[in-house]
């Protein structure tokens, strides 16, 4: 029987050496862009990089800390006029608290204008509407003026309240979440609605719930 002999550099030695993935590889960059762009309602500018978070960070963003039937953590934040406002101010009436990614982005503008167009329905239901994002008060003021928003916008710079409420991020943790809460007169959460890509549906769902309270 004929035999085949391999040269000294056998097949395994011809294959590239693969380095094992270490803990330092948990966050792998998947997007880098030097110029400004927008993606699903979020602004990216000047060397913005997105990364896939580690399994532990994903777990923390998926499981919310505030659940239906609970009273959420209170807050005191500045509104678009620079005045401080606390959640306790709304005790005794229903309140819609919606977290959104950023002012002046396509999805967030649609959502804000949809709340504006239905604002009288919310007032008729006896409810207040409050929007929260990480933008500063001056950004909120310009945003509210441009689109004639009749409700309060609060500045959560550093996203402290977003984290305390456990608002989940989207797209592997790279996008701030778009989540709406409806609190009843006692300050207890009766609805949590999350929909990043259909911002107008937040209005339909919250009105439906308010009409049943």
From Swiss-Prot:
List UniProt keywords, sorted A-Z: Antioxidant, Chloroplast, Disulfide bond, Oxidoreductase, Peroxidase, Plastid, Redox-active center, Thylakoid, Transit peptide
Active-site residues, Swiss-Prot/TrEMBL:
108 (cysteine sulfenic acid (-soh) intermediate)
Q: Which SUPFAM superfamilies match?
A: Thioredoxin-like
Q: Which segments constitute the Thioredoxin domain?
A: 66-213
Subcellular location(s) of the protein: Plastid, Chloroplast thylakoid lumen
CDD domains (UniProt xref): PRX_BCP
For this entry, the transit peptide stretch runs 1-54
Induction behaviour: By pathogen attack.
Q: Does the record carry Membrane as a key word?
A: no
Q: How does it assemble?
A: Monomer.
Q: Protein name, please?
A: Peroxiredoxin Q, chloroplastic
Native source species: Populus jackii (Balm of Gilead)
